[in-house]
């Protein structure tokens, strides 16, 4: 049985070998390029299903708050303008935007597989099918989850005798984040990953993501010196910094799950 100290040393060794700080920076750049195409695809899919009309506003709030917790209103206005402009594009332009979104998913796929040291690549056709499924079904899953959460929230708010339920309801965003991370760490690597290892890594990532968002918002609000330096351009560095922190959290959780997998395989041998 490996000690906690040795586990920590192995985790840090793998984290350094995989250069996850630099990888988070590269994914941040890819995310900035793919953000508008992703949002365009998501809301285009939502517009095709009238049942999601009521949750579209909540989805926008969730996306903008997670990408830039302290500047969500301004980011939301910019993204809305970009998406509105994209509707005037030709078919070739739209295909190009979708290709950029698929490239981001491909980068995420390759990054997570490298963390698991998986050299077995999927066939191009299989990869495209999986990426397209993520791009199309992902928004629907998120929409259904938001709709269910909204329904539960309304149900609890209409009752005066469910104060405990209202308190428990505050954990729904965390549980949803935990579930999404667990799903990513289990499905994306092109190898069998034990669900409990994915859940452990996802739990750590969900905690860091939730606390990090609150701490980041507090820092930006409490120490607004960045506004004096950047002025009207302050939103851009804020968003870049938060996206990089978010990717670092995702990669830390993935590395934890991968390290647990590695130790588990050594014990079985």
From Swiss-Prot:
Compartments where found: Cell inner membrane
Coiled-coil stretches: none
Segments passing through the bilayer: 32-52, 89-109, 128-148, 168-188, 203-223, 232-252
GO cellular component: plasma membrane
Mode of membrane association: Multi-pass membrane protein
Keyword tags: Cell inner membrane, Cell membrane, Membrane, Transmembrane, Transmembrane helix
Principal cellular location given in the protein's record: membrane
Source taxon at top rank: Bacteria
HAMAP family for this protein: UPF0761
Family statement drawn from the similarity comment of this UniProt entry: Belongs to the UPF0761 family.
NCBIfam families associated with the record: PRK01637.1, yihY_not_rbn
Name of the protein described by the UniProt record: UPF0761 membrane protein HI_0276
